[in-house]
Structures are given as C-alpha cells and as structure tokens.
C-alpha cells in the first residue's frame, strides 16, 4: 500500500538525504585518528575486597557496594584493616563497572613500589550495579547519597593512624563525575570531605540525551548550585575529555563553566594533555596508559610531605594540574622552582654569534655552554627559538645578565619551555627580557646517545602568516594556500575567521626536502587559545600530510584570539599549506552537536502529516496515503519561522514577562544559543533529515504490518471485515484497566509498550481482513474511489449506518499507519526507563520515580480506543474540525520545546491522539 504511492522524485530526494546523513554519521563514528592508546597491564592478579557497610545502609541501597582494589602482596596486607595510604574513590559512569578502577589503581601501585612505598594510594571503587544513569535519571540522587555514605565509611578505615586523612580524592568516569559534583548539593555534605575531583569524559554542561525530566532536573540543580556558590567552592576540579574518538560524549559537554571568580577548575581534551597527545573513546579513557600515567604523576606531585596526604593548598593543586595537563616544561614539578641557577664547574664555554645554529651531540665527554650574545640580535630580530631532541628533565637553557661571554649564574629559562612528542622547545620574545645579555644553551656530557640542539633568531613578521579559511558553502571546490619560503624551524599560521563549531576544514601540508638523507620529523600543532583542545600531528618529511580542523567549543563572543597552526619544521625543507572546506566533516559536526534533536524533528514531520490526513478526512471524506501527505505537509516553512519569531520576540522585555507569566518553559533555541550551538541552516538540515527519517520509518512500519498480516493469514484462518463498528468492544475496558494496573504497579513504559503491541495487533488484524476481502472479491473497476466519494456526497445509506466497506478499511489503515509511526517514537523515547527497570528487577519491582507513569495513564485509554477506531466513524464527528487544527501548532511546539528536552516530545504527541479518540464519541 505504501509503495504504490511512492513518487520517484521524492524517493530520489530521500535517498539523497540518506546519503548526506551517512556522510555525517561516518565522520562521527569513523572520521578520527586510530586508537593510539597503549593498554595498561596488571603485573599481579587484581583483587577487589568488599568493604562491609552498616546493615542499615545495605538495606537502603541493596544494589550498591564498595570495594578496595589491590594486587598481590598489597591486597593480602590490606585485607586486615585499617589502612595507611591516601584514599582515592573511583566512581564508574553509565553502565560502568567498579572493576574499571584496576588500570589507574595498578599504575599507582607500581609507582608506589618505585619509591619503596614512601607514599601510596588506596583505590576504592563503588559498584553502582552498572546502572544506565545516562538513560534514566531517577537514580542519580540515590547514587549521590550512597557516595556520601561511602566517603564517611572510607575515612573511618583510617581512624587511629598517624597521618589519617580527613578527605578523599575522587576520580569520576562519565556520569560518575557528575555524581561527584552533585555531592556538594547535599544538605549535610561537608565540602572538606573532597580534596580533589578528576572527571573523565563527564558531560558537565548538559545530558547527552535528555530522555526524562529527572536527569534534566538533576543537571539543573548541580550546575545552578556550582554557579551560584562559585565563590565558596574551593574544590579543585579537573575535567578531561576524550576528543573526537569519543562519539558517546562530545568533548564540548565536558568543559566546566568558566566563571571569572572561580579559578579552581580546568577542562582539557586528552589530545592536548602533555605526554598523552591522543584522543580516547568513551571507555578507553579509563585504561589509556598515557593518560593514566599522567594522572598518577600528578597525584604523587600533589602529596604534602608533612601530612603525607594530598595537599590542601589550592594554588599548589592548580600548579600541579597545569604542569601535567596543560603545559609541561620537560622538567620535574617543583612548587617553588629556583629561577636562578649556578653555571659553574669545568664546563667549556663557546660563543655563538650566528643567527641560526645547530649542534649534534654524540658521545660528548665534556659539558658545553653555548652562549648567544643578544646585543646585535636585538637590533634585527624580535624572537629567539631553541629546541632540543634530548627529552630529559634537566635544565638546558638559561639567560645571562652579565655583559661578558660567560656568567656564573643565569636565569633558568627551561621553565618557559614546552614539551612536545619529539622535542622540547622554547620561544622567547626578546623585548620581554631586556636585562638579558646572553642566551646560554647547555649540552651535558652524554655517552652512547645522540641528540640535536637547534637555535635561531627571527622576526615575528617573517614567521607569522595569515591564512583565511574558505567559506562554508565552497563545499571543498575552492582552496587557499600559503607557502613557507624561508628555511626556519618554527612558524605560526593564523587561521582567520575560524571559530564556529559548524566550520570544518581539511588542511594539507606538503613538505619538500633537500640535503639531509636522515629521517626528519615535523610537528604540526593546532592551537585553540580559548579552550584546551589542541591536537598534534607528527609527520615524517618529505611527505603530504592531511589535518582535520574542527572545534569542540565555539569561540566566545568577547574573545578576539585567533586559532593557530603552529609548525615545528626542518630547516632543510620547504612547506606548502593548503586549506579547503570539508563538507562531510561539516555534516559530521551537525550530527555530533545536533543529532540528539533528530527525534523531535521526526515527530514534528509526522505530526504535520497527521494533521494533513485529518484535514483530508474532513474536507474530502477520505484519507491520503502517509507518504503522499508527508510530501505535501512536512515543510520546514510551516515550523521554523514561528520558532525564529518567538526567539526574536523573547528579546523584548514585555514579551519575556508575558512568557514567564503564563509559565512557559525556556525556548530550546535560546538554550542552544547560550551554548554557541546555533548556526545557519541547522534547523533546516535537521528538518530535512527528520522528514527523511519519517519517510523511511513509515515505509518500514507499513512493510512490517503487511508482512505480519501475511504471517497471520498463513497461521490462522482468513479473517473477515467487521460488519459493525464497535468502538467499545467487550474486552476493551478490561485490557485498559489491566494496562493501567501494570503501569501503576511496575513500570509505565512497560504498559505503554503492551498497549502499543495491542494497537499493532489490531492494525495487523485489519490488514489481514482487508487482504482476505480483496482476494475474495472480483475486480470491479466501477467501484472506484470516485464512485465512493459520490456515494458519500449523496449520503448513501451504507455510510449513514456506518457500515465498514473495503475503501473505509483502506482509509482506516492509512490513518493507523501514521498513528503507528507516532506511537513508535513515543515507545522508543520511553524505552530507556523500561530497560533500566528490567535490569534492576531483582532489586525493585516498581520503578520509582517513574517518568512515564503520567504519560501512560493518558496514552493507554487513547490507544485502546484508537485500536478500534475507523475513519468512517471519525469523519462524522463534530470534533474533527478542531482536532485537525492541533497537529500544526504541536509540530511547532515539538521543535520549540522538545529538541533539547526529548522527554517533552511524547507530551505533544499524546494531545492529538486523545482528541482523535474522543472523535468517536462527539
């Protein structure tokens, strides 16, 4: 039936939309670097010792447990409590296991062994029963309260110890990080119980999929508390995102709110973390060896030697985190580093007067100081740049104040350096150091190892170039190019007009080298100055290297910085940089940032088609095919202008006051604008994707009904069309009451699913009856739709008595097809709470709180009546004219209020369905 109404042009359009959506999905799920994380290994068998909690607590939280992680002899020793280390609590996230603590716990244990257990950490982990808290937010508050009790229980294990801790450090993965932040919102919680919070791939800004009001309210409470109490929160917090490999939680959601008066929070993407430099997926972030090593190094540097616990000094905490996660100078962390260093001993001093210098050190027996006098260089150049391939942690570059060619003391400039994968580098603006007479590079004595030191002086203008990015709608057909003609070591390319999340580019760097036959490495670093989301690309030159340019966080309105492509190059090579728009990556950004809103646009399109069918039934007496009416009615100009107009009017104070007076919720478009997520044409693109999805879902549901009806006819004797229409069949009240009882006593989503299956059964039965009727009737061309319209116009006696004919059955099936599509999305959006309930059935028979219960009490009776509804009874209703007007404003409402709050979408669906059901009685 559905296939007969397919228009080839429309079909081609929908196929094209599928192609575009596939490009975007491919970029999200496959368009990133390979997994470069090293696996972390346990050298001894991991053990999880269950911590006994008070019986009252276990009764209140029967599904939750607390464990202590250990290995080998450490695990054996600590089976006899109390403990003597530094407590760290790991909180797993959505569907996460308490055993995920083993990677970081094992690395911390090995580090403690290296220092003979001078300090060591005790890693605890909470078992949340792998609850799906990203899908159902009703248990988040319960988890938060349990963690509070766990912290108190952990600290009791250290009672009586000489250096007993008074607080714990928390590492939270995914939603576990949000639960940790929520601790501060508890009435009886003391903030001093947490000394450090590290979150990994935690969506702090908003839920990934707001599928129920509980998760949205939880986010609102947590974020509002942190914003309103920012001055009083002295908890040092680090949020680490996974980058583009993490398609479950996009990195933009992990950035903590930036408040001018709250400076104890850092947010960084793993690709920008020194000594990590890789993107991680949502699960590998807990076992990625590079990242866990960085985390543990920071933890050990945070220890206060006097208390043998994590320091209570906020300034030191931030210094340590900046050192390890933001900018690493290739030196061991020191709280108060000595700026002045002694340059003494029997070292050789060599003056260097050239502007470009390179030294290859191999089997050096003597220490050498290379001194670069600055007097002449200051007249010509603005900057000095040095790099070394020796990646040890010793000081290697100094500044002399003496005017002579050698000095006894120098300013240690090594703290200004930056560690990169293959080099450590330092760039100095000479005017910032007017008192320096020399720059001194120190080359230690080495045996058996080889490294290279390079230095050069340059003018900023010669090494800084501007490269305007190509236009969004160039679709990769045009490009812009810049050539690095000078043979320098370091270049800055300013990427002008690049600062929006919808922008995406492909950069190609071609290097051509002469002279050296040795393997040469170049580093290309994308630096985003308004957020720590840098990424590095290492290339062996000569080569042609592609780099993807796209953002996790848009540039703030008041930020004037420019994104940079920093190039650490070889003086033997020339480089050509080409940039062009990447259309597939733009589609990927649309899917990445707005894919979660697609169900709202799908339902909006179906509602428009539904309204068109009701109006067709009112005006012509028959119902159009779903695909035909979808093509006719699902137009973006029926929805978007209203949303844009409302958003515009909300900018006026009088309209905003009126809006608040009638208690309307905040417009979703305003929420997206506040998160810098609104960009041109995104609503149009999403509407087209939504209409395309509605079309293919309609095709799928229609095909499924026909297949099920064929199966029905194969298994059962042929059914007949009912001779009398009975909206209230004898079994209807019983089924309705049963489903309502199921909803009240177990789970609302379960009752909705059962009602949906009942409705599908009724439609399949009607389809089977119609098929049987057609197979048994001779083909008679006189009985056409036109003749039926004529008979309807003359109020034929069969219609007057509401006799159901084959054409009326076809009309009913067309209407049922649309209703099934609407109900399918309602069921899909309610499924998360059902899955959560099924998973926790052994602990709780009744889901509480239940986000779907109010919806179920309205939807179940409506579905029961609609299952027995035929168009012949609806089109004679006085209520039909009013009902046919509902879907259009509701389609607007779905986009206005449901695109960022998906749990509201079923509420807009249920209204026309209830009134449609009432048409049988009015």
Curated annotation (Swiss-Prot):
Keywords: Endoplasmic reticulum, Glycoprotein, Hydrolase, Membrane, Protein transport, Transmembrane, Transmembrane helix, Transport. InterPro entries: AB_hydrolase_fold, PGAP1-ab_dom-like, PGAP1/BST1, PGAP1_TMD. The active site is at 174. Disruption phenotype: Homozygous knockout mice lacking Pgap1 show otocephaly and die right after birth. However, some survived with growth retardation. Homozygous male knockout mice show severely reduced fertility despite the capability of ejaculation. GO terms for cellular component: endoplasmic reticulum; endoplasmic reticulum membrane. Its EC number is 3.1.-.-. It comes from the Eukaryota. Pfam families: PGAP1, PGAP1_2nd, PGAP1_3rd, PGAP1_TMD. Residues 1-11, 619-641, 690-694, 755-817, 916-922 are cytoplasmic. It is found in: Endoplasmic reticulum membrane. GO terms for molecular function: deacylase activity; hydrolase activity, acting on ester bonds. Residues 782-793 have a biased composition (Basic residues). Glycans are attached at residues 363, 402, 558. SUPFAM superfamilies: alpha/beta-Hydrolases. PANTHER family: GPI INOSITOL-DEACYLASE (PTHR15495:SF7), NEGATIVE REGULATOR OF VESICLE FORMATION-RELATED (PTHR15495). GPI inositol-deacylase that catalyzes the remove of the acyl chain linked to the 2-OH position of inositol ring from the GPI-anchored protein (GPI-AP) in the endoplasmic reticulum. Initiates the post-attachment remodeling phase of GPI-AP biogenesis and participates in endoplasmic reticulum (ER)-to-Golgi transport of GPI-anchored protein. This is GPI inositol-deacylase.
